[in-house]
Structures are given as C-alpha cells and as structure tokens.
Curated annotation (Swiss-Prot):
Name of the protein described by the UniProt record: UvrABC system protein A
Keywords: ATP-binding, Cytoplasm, DNA damage, DNA excision, DNA repair, DNA-binding, Excision nuclease, Metal-binding, Nucleotide-binding, Repeat, SOS response, Zinc, Zinc-finger
Binding positions for ATP 1 per the UniProt entry: 33-40
Binding site for ATP 2: 639-646
Main location: cytoplasm
Signal peptide annotation: none
Pfam families associated with the record: UvrA_DNA-bind, UvrA_inter
GO biological process: nucleotide-excision repair; SOS response
Taxonomic lineage from the root: Bacteria, Bacillati, Bacillota, Bacilli, Bacillales
Gene: uvrA
Stated role: The UvrABC repair system catalyzes the recognition and processing of DNA lesions. UvrA is an ATPase and a DNA-binding protein. A damage recognition complex composed of 2 UvrA and 2 UvrB subunits scans DNA for abnormalities. When the presence of a lesion has been verified by UvrB, the UvrA molecules dissociate.
Organism in which the protein naturally occurs: Oceanobacillus iheyensis (strain DSM 14371 / CIP 107618 / JCM 11309 / KCTC 3954 / HTE831)
One cellular component term from this protein's GO annotations in UniProt: excinuclease repair complex
Length: 958
C-alpha cells in the first residue's frame, strides 16, 4: 500500500539534531525558519539527496561513473520517498547559447513549426520561393478569363554583365525568332549590341497564347520547353497586365536564391546547419569598444587618454603615438574630445596607405627607425587579441572589448537562409524577440491555410501551453531570445518550474528553493496557483520559503529552529499554518499571527540638498529615465519584475560610480549624465555571492579579525620565547601549518565508484596546525580551538581586546552569532555570506561618504533575520552613509526613507519612474503604483499593531 507520508528518522545532516518528522505526501509543504536553521539541510541535503541517490543506485556501476557520485545523507531512515526533482537557484546555465526559448523547449517547437509550415521567401525580391509542377503552372494560367493574351518566356540571362554574343548566336541557330532584351522586344536577327559593363536580362519568347478552351495541352508543351531552356524558371507575360514567374526549382526565379529542404536543424543556432557563420550562432562578437579604449575624454593624449597604450612596461606605444601626431600635426596637449574628428579617425582607425616615419628608443638607449602605414589603435588592439598566445595579454585586452551585435546576422544568430523562411511575414528570430504576452497573442492570431492548420495544430498547442505557464509564474515580460545567463535566480527558477509543469509528471517529489525571489507581490498569487496546480497532479511539493502568502497558502507548515546554526536543527512546529500560528514556541507562528512584527520607523530621515542624479537612462527597457537618489538616506527601488530596477541600479548607478571612483574598466549602461559623484568617496555592492570559493576562506579571514587574533597569539610569552611571528599562526603558508594536509585539516580520498571520502588528517587530527604551533595558548586555548569558537563565544573570549571585539560585535549584530570563526565559506548560505560582507564593512570607521548597494538582500532571510538586517541598514544611514536597495519585500519597503517605484509593468511596458517619495506618499498613489496598492494595507496594519502594543505596555505598567 502506498504510504501517505514521507517518514524521516534520525536526520543529522549539518546542524540537524537527530530529528524525526512525517511530511504528508501530495501536499504543498512549506519549510521555514531562521537563515541557517537547517531548512536546506533537511529539504535539499537530506530528502532530495536521498531520493536522487536511490535513483542513481538503481543504475549499473558503468552508468554511475558518468553521473557523479551522490553522498548518502546522515539519516537513519527515510520511507515513502518518490522520485525527486530539485529546482533551486544555483543550477541555471550561464552558457551564452542557452536562452529562455531553449530552456523551456519552446524554441524546439518553434523550429519544428517553421520547418513544417514556414514559407521560404527571397530576401532580395520578397518573392515566395516554391517549386511548382507543370500542372500547377498550367492551372494558374488558365484562371485568367478567356481571350486573355499572354506570352511564355524562358529566362536565359538574369542580371549578368557582358555582351552575351555567344548566347545570342546560339539562340539564332536554334531557330528562335523573338527575344526580350532588358524589357524590350527584339528579333533574334537584329544586330543586338550589349554594353559589356552593364547587367542585362535576356528572355526567349517560346510561345504566344490566347486563353481559350482546349489550349491546355499546347500550354503544357510550351511551358516544358521554356523550363528546359530557362533551367527550371519561366516568365508568363500577361499582355497589358502583370507578369508571373514560376520555378520548378526551390529557388527565386529572379536571382536564384535558394533554400534546401526545410528541416528543424536549419533553425538551430547551436547547429552548423543553421548558425550564422560569422558569429557561430552567438548573435554577438567581441569587438574593441571605443568607450573602454578612451574611458575619459577630458584627458589629453600626453596624459595617456588611450588606456590600452598606457606606458606600463614599455614606452613603445607612447612613442608610436607621438610619431603619428607629429606627422599629422595633432595636438597632444588638448583634451581628446577637442581633437578634430578627422584627426581622431586617424588615431583610432589608422592612416590607410600613408606611411609614417617612426622612431623608437628602447630602455637601453638604442634607436630603431622605420617607415610604415599606421594601423590605428582599434585595429591594433583587435589584432593583438587575435594573434597573442598569452592568456594574460588576452585577458588584459579583453577589458577594452565589449560584446556587440554580429554585423552579418544583426544579432539574430541564424544564417540568411533560415531568416528567409517566414510565417505571417515574420522569421523565427522576429518571433523570439516578442515578450511572452505578445507571443501568446501572436500565436492565437496566426493566419494559416486549412492544410497548414492541420499540420501545426499539435505544435501550436504545445507552444501555447508553455507560454501560458510562463505567463502564470509572472514572467510575461521576458522574451524567448533572452540569454539564460542574464536571468536572476528567481526568474531562472520559475522558468524551470514552468518547464516542469509542461511535462505534467505525477507522483513526483519537487523540492523548491524560494520560488518567490524577485517576484512582486502582484504576481505572488499566480505563482501560488501554479504550485497548487502541480500539487493537484498528485505531486508532493516541499518549498523552502519565507513569503507570508505562500506560508498561509500551504497545506502543511514546518518551522525549523528555534535559532540558527548550533541553536537550530530542531522541529519547532509541524502542522497546518493555522495551528502553527497558535504555537507559542514557533517564532514563525508569532510573526504570522501578528504577535511579533517589524515596527515602522518612528521617524523618517528627510532628504537634504545632496543627491546622486542619473539623467537620460535608456539601457535595456529604461525609457530616458531621470532619477534622484538622496544622500544619507535609505532608498528602496521597487517595481514589478522586469520593470528595470536592476538595470538602473546595477548597470547604471553602480557601474558609473565604480568607474568614476575606482577608474574601473566597466562600461555603464546607456545614460546621458550622472551628477553628484563628489558627495561620495566609495561605493560598495553587497551581493549574495560567496565570500570565498574554497574552505580556506572563512568569516575570520574575510572580516580581517584573523589578522588581529594571530597578532594576539604572536604577542604571548610562549610565542616570543620560541621566536614565532604572526605568520606562524596562518594555515595558508608553510611554517606553522600541518604539512601533511597543507593546513586543510582533512584529506580527500578518491573512491571511483563510491563518493569521495573526506577523513581527518592523521597527523594533526583536523587541527590544521603542527604540534609546536598548537602548544602556544592564549587564555588556555590554542589557535585551532579559537577557530572552532562560535562568534558569540569569541566575543566573550576576546572581550578585553577592543580591536577584535569591535569586528566580532558587528558580525554578532547582523545575527550571525551562531557561526564559527573558522567555518568554511563554502558552507555559508547566500544570506549569511551577504551579512558577513555587511559586518566587515560596518566595523570600518564611517566617513558619511559611503554608498551601499544591495540587490534583494532579503533572499533566504526569515522575518526575524530581516528585522536584524534592517536595524543594521538603519545604523549605516544614521552614520550619514547612503543605502540603495532593490527590494520586493514589504517590510523593507515600509522602512525606507525614500522610494523610487518603476513600472508600470515589466519588459517593454515598464522602464519608467511612476512614483517617488516616502512609503506613505507611495501608498496614496495606488491608482498608478502596484507597490502603493500592496503597501497601503501593510502600513495601516502595522500602525494599528504599534498602537495596540503601546497600549498593552501602558496597561501593564499601570
């Protein structure tokens, strides 16, 4: 009998404390809890990992070696598991060949559609290319009314230069009488002189016919003769009316442009049969970018305005440039922007064939003279990039290059033959450039013949279904041609969700990781409906989620806690959402029921005169937007998914500030101007990328506190007696570390058909250091034991050393008291990594001129974590520094001093600023702002809660 639940006993993965739990099957189950409490350990590292492992175990050992090994999770028993599919945010392809269309398989169906009902059309003449039989040609001609006069012509020369004497002579010998030369009727016996260097057309008159009964067989004979002479092409000249062209070849009857047999691979940009030969189907080419070559047009040539020719290791290029400027009389002491265009063209594009006398003196004083044309800066960079075999030089030159649309295919990725196949006047790449919403309308309004409809019916059904699913998960603004690498984690996850629904599997266990990331409240209901639809197909959904709406919509809610890290890993509540709300032990329940909440700020900071002003932003879908970001405030940029928030903040504001402050080689998105940079001296982008990619990186090394701890150990009497400096206490360099494991503390043993086994080092037993180093102790602990301390314990341990205490205090303040000093960076979640970065910035002295940028910082955070994060961000703003956040979370939005709301919709229908002001001002603009619509009830609710809390406190005091 099929079990009704997934039974887990004795789960101990990571921080899970030997837990037992029953998870109901065929239900929407939400796992929640503080960041680091063990949600992912239970969902992904235990349940999914075991489901996946059991499937792989069923394969032969030969097949298993190709699949990579699955570790067996640390759990006693899991019963009732179904085949498991995980949809997380990390596994999206960054391959430039991957697009929304290919990931969702819609593009595969589109290729099939174009191969079956597409109409090849000559790109030069706009004529539909089709091969016809003689019978079809006769039938078409006989459609004309009786007494219609026409003549049948065989084209022997079509738009070719020459005198064509031989051809005319042959026609005379073969007995033909009339010909048409360049649209003029002539006799073959005439003296026809053609100009050698002009293009000519010659057609032979095969027959003159009047349409009447019984003419069909004569017409048929004449057409056959004409086809033979015209190599498969004929022209029917209807006297006084139109001209018809027929072809029995699959080619344009005028210019001969032909397409082979239509097959799906012709439309694939990942196949040599369909890909543009110039860019190999990528649609873009790496070209030298003038804005990166000359980043600052205010500089002069003598001030090294040309970045790739800066004299870093040699004076060769500056001397070459000087010779060019001397030859053409170019002033090297005026700003580059003032150099006349003609002279600038010589510097950038070269001198053509004109030779220049060039003199070069090397570092040893010897002089070399030569005379040669000047190739130009842009061609020089491109040539060196092409010809070098050095990875270092290639990487250096890449900084001056950018991806630009391929000039051959104009960014469409396909060869011209594929782009010549049309349906309703559009080629396949035109269709993929439509947004999902526009595509749905396009396919509903396709104008197909009855035969084409029959062929395309099933293909269109599949395409419509998949487009509808994408629309339902709030991705209506994406285009099918969008590359997968440019999608946010939430978008990529929802695309894969839509693909899974399209497959309509049943009896599957889906494990999802925060599918609501990057989704505006407006689209949340659609996502929840999608999840319920998957559940209704008899699937079990285990969703790791912090979103209130999703938790309340769940059939079953599991709260893991009570704290995070060492303080978590237990099941606090496992029940229906309604019962969890009544559970006094559950922190999540308290927030859901409103007993706990994030209060509104008692007062909001007022903007002063200082601001960063972006003018004329028009990158991606931004429509010439001008935005003002006040300095010293907490500003939140809001708007529905795809409205242009990331483009404005990450592509324009961050890159412009980084380029200006750090002379970075990044190219900001399109905008006219940015003002107010003088108000800041550093810009910090705090994202959720890992703080280090190896286990050697940890919170202690990242925040810099490990340096101070090593100083403390080096100052101990024992260390001084032994002559140990601080380097002795590093596990990254020889000296103090254990050389058997090179300071890793563990050894990896490869077990080909089984998972790799990691065992503690036999010499140091996981301590990372050699015996002599471990003999040095501070307050009874050696350096290895100190790295094992949790942040909260380390705070107590180093309370007498202000320098260390200050750095650790900030890590504790952002809610990471539970992580260990030496915890490998690879084991930290995205939210934890982001907070370590925040903490390492916080302990630095504030100048009031720092500008912090955070893109969806609430990802992976519980409401209680968000509360802590907000108090840290408010602290930054209290110091006079500026905070700019992209966010959908209403708790963050309601805490802002200033909001910039983009919209009104996503994609092409977005890209405008529709409202700015305080949260209260945005809430009043519900008619134009979706954010205002959802923010208004939250503000009212929290004001009421704050009043009730105040009353309760007053009553309890009295």
């Amino acid at each position: 009998m099929q079990s009704k639940s997934i039974k887990i006993q004795g789960a101990r993965t990571h921080n899970l404390k030997d837990i037992d739990i029953d998870i109901p099957k065929n239900k929407l189950v939400v796992l929640t809890g503080l960041s680091g409490s063990g949600k992912s350990s239970l969902a992904f590292d235990t349940i999914y990992a075991e489901g996946q492992r059991r499937y792989v175990e069923s394969l032969s050992s030969y097949a298993r070696q190709f699949l990579g090994q699955m570790d067996k999770p640390d759990v006693d028993v899991i019963e009732g598991l179904s085949p498991a599919i995980s949809i997380d945010q990390k596994t999206t392809s960054k391959n430039p060949r991957s697009t929304v269309g290919t990931v969702t398989e819609i593009y595969d169906y589109l290729r099939l559609l174009y191969a079956r009902v597409g109409r090849p059309t000559c790109p030069n003449h706009g004529i539909e290319i089709s091969s016809q039989t003689v019978q079809q040609m006769v039938d078409r001609i006989l459609e004309y009314p009786e007494r219609t006069k026409l003549q049948i012509l065989a084209p022997v020369v079509s738009g070719r230069k020459g005198e064509h004497v031989k051809i005319l002579e042959n026609l005379k010998q073969e007995g033909y009488v009339r010909i048409r030369v360049d649209n003029e009727m002539r006799e073959v016996t005439d003296d026809i002189q053609l100009e050698k260097n002009k293009k000519h057309s010659i057609e032979v008159v095969i027959d003159r016919i009047v349409v009447k009964d019984g003419v069909a067989s004569r017409l048929s004979d004449s057409i056959e003769t004409a086809l033979k002479l015209g190599e498969g092409n004929i022209i029917v000249d209807v006297i006084g009316e139109e001209e018809l062209t027929f072809s029995e070849n699959h080619a344009c009857p005028i210019c001969g442009f032909s397409i082979g047999e239509l097959e799906p691979r012709l439309f694939s940009f990942n196949s040599p049969f369909g890909a543009c030969p110039s860019c190999d189907g990528l649609g873009t080419k790496l070209e030298v970018d003038i804005d990166l070559v000359i980043p600052d047009w205010e500089k002069t040539l003598n001030e090294n305005a040309i970045a790739p020719w800066e004299p870093i290791s040699s004076q060769y290029y500056p001397q070459l440039l000087k010779s060019v400027c001397n030859h053409f009389g170019i002033d090297m002491d005026i700003p580059v922007k003032e150099i006349p265009q003609q002279q600038m063209d010589i510097i950038l594009q070269g001198s053509g064939k004109e030779k220049i006398k060039f003199e070069y003196e090397n570092d040893f004083g010897s002089i070399r003279r030569s005379e040669a044309p000047f190739e130009g800066v842009l061609k020089n960079v491109a040539r060196r990039y092409r010809e070098t075999s050095s990875d270092f030089i290639r990487e250096t030159l890449e900084k001056y290059m950018a991806q630009k649309n391929c000039p051959t295919c104009k960014g469409h990725r396909l060869k011209k033959e594929a782009l010549a196949v049309l349906i309703n006047g559009k080629h396949i790449s035109n269709v993929t450039d439509y947004s999902i919403v526009e595509s749905i309308q396009l396919f509903q309004q396709l104008d197909l013949t009855e035969k084409e409809q029959q062929i395309a019916r099933l293909i269109l059904k599949e395409i419509d279904n998949r487009l509808e699913f994408l629309n339902n998960v709030g991705l209506d603004y994406l285009t099918l041609s969008r590359t997968a690498g440019t999608l946010s984690g939430g978008e990529a996850q929802r695309i894969r969700l839509a693909t899974q629904i399209g497959s309509a599997l049943t009896g599957v266990l889906y494990v999802l990781d925060e599918p609501s990331i990057g989704l505006h409240q407006r689209d949340n209901d659609r996502l929840i409906d999608t999840l319920k639809r998957m559940r209704d197909l008899d699937n079990t959904l285990i969703v790791v989620e912090h979103d209130e709406d999703t938790m309340l919509a769940a059939d079953w809610l599991v709260d893991i806690g009570p704290g995070a890290g060492e303080h978590g890993g237990e099941i606090v509540a496992s029940d229906t959402p309604q019962n969890v709300m009544k559970n006094e032990q559950s922190l999540t329940g308290k927030y859901l029921s409103g007993k706990e909440f994030i209060p509104l700020p008692t007062k909001r900071r007022k903007p002063n005169k200082r601001k960063i002003e972006v003018m004329g932003a028009s990158e991606n879908n931004l429509k010439n937007v001008s935005a003002k970001i006040p300095i010293g405030l907490m500003t939140v940029v809001t708007g529905v998914s795809g409205s242009g928030k990331s483009t404005l903040v990450n592509e324009i504001v961050y890159k412009s500030l980084a380029k200006s402050l750090y002379k970075g080689k990044v190219k900001p998105g399109k905008h006219k101007k940015i003002k107010g940079i003088e108000h800041i001296d550093k810009v910090i982008d705090i994202d959720q990328s890992p703080i280090g990619r190896t286990p050697r990186s940890n919170p202690a090394t990242y925040t810099g506190v490990f340096d101070d701890i090593r100083d403390v150990f080096a100052q101990t009497n024992e260390a001084k007696v032994r002559g140990y400096k601080k380097g002795r206490f590093s596990f990254n360099v020889k000296g103090g570390r254990c050389e058997a494991c090179r300071g890793d503390g563990i050894l990896k043993i490869e077990m080909h058909f089984l998972p790799d086994v990691y065992v503690p080092c036999e010499v140091c037993h996981g301590a990372r250091y050699n015996r002599e180093t471990l003999e040095v102790k501070y307050k009874g602990k050696n350096i290895s034991e100190v790295l094992e301390l949790r942040i909260e314990e380390a705070l107590e341990f180093f309370s007498a050393i202000p320098k260390i205490k200050r750095k650790l205090q900030t890590v504790y303040d952002v809610g990471l008291g539970y992580i260990r000093l030496g915890q490998p960076a690879t084991t930290l979640s995205g939210g934890e990594a982001q907070r370590v970065k925040l903490a390492s910035e916080l302990h630095k002295r504030s100048t009031g001129k720092s500008f912090y940028i955070l893109d969806e910082p609430t990802t992976g955070l519980h409401v209680d974590d968000i509360r802590r994060l907000l108090s840290v961000l408010q602290r930054i703003a209290d110091n006079g520094d500026s905070v700019l956040i992209i966010e959908h979370n209403l708790d963050v939005i309601k805490s802002a001093d200033h909001i910039i709301d983009l919209g009104p919709e996503g994609g092409d229908r977005g890209g405008q600023i529709i409202a700015t002001g305080t949260p209260e001002q945005i809430a009043e603009q519900q008619d134009v702002s979706y954010t205002g619509k959802y923010l208004s009830p939250v503000l009212d609710r929290d004001k009421q809660r704050m009043e009730e809390t105040l009353e309760a406190k007053t009553v309890s005091r009295s």
